[in-house]
Amino acid sequence: CQGTYRGDVTGSQKKYGFLMQAENPDCDTVELYEAPIDAMSGATLRQYTDIGKWRSVHYLALGGLNYLPIDYFLQQHPQVKNVVLCFDRDEPGLRFAETVAQRLAERGCNVEKRLPAVGKDYNESLIWYKSKIEKQRGERV
C-alpha cells in the first residue's frame, strides 16, 4: 500500500537535507533540489543524458524551500564553491532561487540556476525523458 503522507516527522531537524554524496569527497560542486525525488531524478537524468558520471557532484534535497540544509552542508563541505540551483519551475521555486543565489554569491560561491528542461520539476523531466526514450526504442523495433 502506498501512502500519500508528505510532511516532516515530529522532532526532525530541518538542517539535515537528503544528501547523495559525490564519489570524490573533495568534490567542489553541489546541486540543490527541493525534494529527494527531484535529486534522484536529477542524478538519473545525468546518467541518461551523458552529462557525466552521476556521482561526479553532490546532490542535496532541502526538504522544501528551506535554507538551513544549504548552510549546514556548506559548513560541513568548505571545499564546495560551485552551487547549481535545480528548484521547481513555479513561482515559489523561482523566488527562492533568487534569494539563495544572492546569499550564496555573498558567500563567494559560483551559482548557476538550472530549471528543469520539461515540466514543473526534475521528476517530471525524468518521466518525460524516459517516455521519449521508450517511444524511440519502440519505433526501432
Functional labels for PLM-detected ranges:
Residues 10, 33, 64:
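Conserved phosphate-coordination/catalytic loops
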Residues 24-30:
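A short, charged/proline- and glycine-enriched loop
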Residues 34-37, 89:
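Helix N-cap/beta->alpha junction signal
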Residues 1-23:
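Basic, glycine-enriched DNA-binding surface that flanks or lies within the catalytic cores of DNA
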Residues 28, 44-141:
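TOPRIM fold recognition
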